[in-house]
Curated annotation (Swiss-Prot):
InterPro entries linked: NDK-like_dom, NDK-like_dom_sf, Nucleoside_diP_kinase
Top enzyme class: transferase
Subcellular location(s) per record: Cytoplasm
Protein name per UniProt: Nucleoside diphosphate kinase
Binding site for ATP: 11, 59, 87, 93, 104, 114
Gene that this sequence comes from: ndk
Entry keywords, A to Z: ATP-binding, Cytoplasm, Kinase, Magnesium, Metal-binding, Nucleotide metabolism, Nucleotide-binding, Phosphoprotein, Transferase
Record-listed E.C. numbers: 2.7.4.6
Amino acid sequence: MAIERTLSIIKPDAVAKNVIGQIYARFEAAGLKIVAARMVHLARPEAERFYAVHKERPFFKDLVEFMISGPVMVQVLEGENAVLKNRELMGATDPKKAQTGTIRADFADSIDANAVHGSDAAETAQAEVAFFFPGLNIYPR
């Protein structure tokens, strides 16, 4: 199994609920190491650049508004099959369809306020990690 890195974002709704520590505990219990982390309040241009892949989608404007509505916690997770493992921990995008015990089933309110973002593929993860952690801000453990 390959050691990978993936980007995770704890979104404004989950930050406001004070569940960062509970979410981090799930990452670590699943064997994912947090190798970089920072809290940031995204500006509109940053959110628009990060989610540019969705620019033509009908939900783009609402997504950007939500992501700039409060601080987010951004982290790089490292471990075996980190991308897939994180996606399994997150659960389905719609918390109503998410499996019991997943982050979204436990902490998300709606398909829009769905607690977390995670890279969907190894290639995407590389670009997303570089977006938030350019240079040498990642420290292997």
